[in-house]
Amino acid sequence: MTSAAGRRRSRRPFRRILLAVAFVFVVGILGATFAVTTDTLGAGRLFDRAVAKVERFLAGPVPDRPTIATVRVSPRPATPSPTLPAPEPTSDPAASGPPHTPTPTPTPKPTPKRVPVDVEIAANPEAIFAHQLTKTWCAPASVQMTLAYLGLADISDEFQRKVHGRIREWESKSDSLNGNWGPAAMALALDAYGAPGYEVRAYEGRQEALRDAAVALEATGSPVILLTWRGAHTWVMTGFRANADPAIFPDARISGAYILDPWYPSVSSLWGPSDPPGTFQDDAEMVRNYLRWNRPEGTYPDRDGLFIALVPTVVVKPAD
């Protein structure tokens, strides 16, 4: 006959095994959560990609429909400093014909001076900053920040989810072979929320892209969205520095840009830590991050090997 003490002793190893299994399970869950949250060894990206694939399966095939075309921008001629027009010749008193009043010589305008410029349209970058809610939501976050600067949106998580929830209205296979967000979908989203006129532009050179972005930013007072990390990420450009005003001097060199990076404050295992909103990214950082479009999912004939930007073309009136 088994004693009570013997039964208690026989249960102890079983309880210890259960506790050990429970401990390993909890540690595993916590470790997986930490890995996804911090993107350790790319775990966060893998998790988000898995979720995106499930969403894609549920949504069905990517629609093959027309969308906003990518505009190939020709380089602006690098001319010297602006020159004054030659004055119109006055009438010759000795010339035949009836006398007439001489045409007055126009007053020459002063030649613009070539001086460095520092432009930043976002007075308070933190007030319009929105962190992307998942590893793959940089596009809706950048759309949100652009709209927030224009007074057309807030920076709440709810609004970002709302924007992303409408992606099926705008996605197109030619814009993104994987579906979901491409630059054309971003332009359509901006238009849907009151910021029309954004163009998807492609450039041969980085300086050419940054100059055109700077000119558009000055002319419209609206941010530019740069397609960074070979087209895998987005930065919102709210200003720039240059050795001259690019709107006047076509050969002005852009030395960097003021950026809102929706990835902040996350750290990428490939690209490193991101920077706070409004950070000036100098030339070296632009060379490291703003790279030619090159996507692994397939070819994009009008974008591959080019620098891509989403550029404003019209002045957007602030919302009442």
Describe each model-derived feature in a short phrase.
Residues M1-R15:
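Terminal targeting segments of Actinobacterial cell-envelope proteins
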Residues T2, G6, F23-V71, H164-D320:
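Conserved active-site-adjacent core of cysteine acyl-enzyme catalytic domains
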Residues R15-V21:
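Short, hydrophobic alpha-helical membrane anchors of single-pass surface/secreted proteins
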Residues G60-V115:
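Ser/Thr-rich, Proline-interspersed low-complexity disordered segments
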Residues R114-W170:
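Active-site nucleophile-adjacent alpha helix/oxyanion-hole segment immediately C-terminal to the catalytic cysteine
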